[in-house]
Amino acid sequence: MRGAVTPILRSLTPISAVLITLNEERRLAAALESVRFCDEILVLDGGSTDRTREIAEAAGARVEFRAWEGFTAQRNHAVAAARHDWILAVDADERITPALRAEIEALRAAGFAHAGYRIPRVAFYLGRWIRGTDWYPDPQLRLFDRRRGRWTGGLVHESVSVNGPVGRLRNDFEHHTYDDISDHLGTIDRYTTLWAQQARAEGKRAGPLDGCVASTWAFIRNYVIRRGFLLGEAGLTVSMFNAYYTYAKMAKLRELERTGMTGAAPE
């Protein structure tokens, strides 16, 4: 029986699951388990000092090392190092669900018809799935042909750009976001600083009231228009913090303008 199915399996387009890591020992194993259906699992580690590399190797992943150069550069190095042209990009805090796996398997059995595919992402936060606010459906282009696509971006919010048509998948992949509110606030602080530095380097400016107006609209959009109010305390918290993120990044840009700082160039 095994010999009978082997030719069929070999005719499928191979997929490389690609992850970048830096001290991800707590979350990595589950992410790796979720992509075991792929033909290769490649982990590009940026210099972890915990058990990340050991966990990846134990899971059967091919582990490569490259000193951390920032998210965009690291992701592109990982894509280039993969053995196969079709890439499934996953982070250590993300999981491919069984339903999404089945959809991807059916897609490649039929033959990939697009240069890449956007996949909806659902976050788990404060004890529940967040299907609302700006966090959902949060489509991410994570399945793509590297011959026609690459990661682009600056200090924050990198994404895949492809040359060709983009399809959409129906099933979500999971994002296990922050450990707690303190972790969330710490991430907001880091990312708003990076955003302000990048905006300053690009010559962007913010008026005195821009942060107030933009953050007010962010809360209305998240809590009312995108139905955060249906998600209880978690929906309110996400909406408030998304508004705070918007205000903080504008305030930090204003601060750079006042001090005359140019912003940081490298990631």
Predicted regions and their residues:
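Cell-envelope/extracellular polymer assembly enzymes that use nucleotide-activated donors
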Residues: 14-16
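Catalytic-site signature of metal-activated, phosphate-bearing donor transferases
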Residues: 72-79, 85-86, 90, 97-260, ...
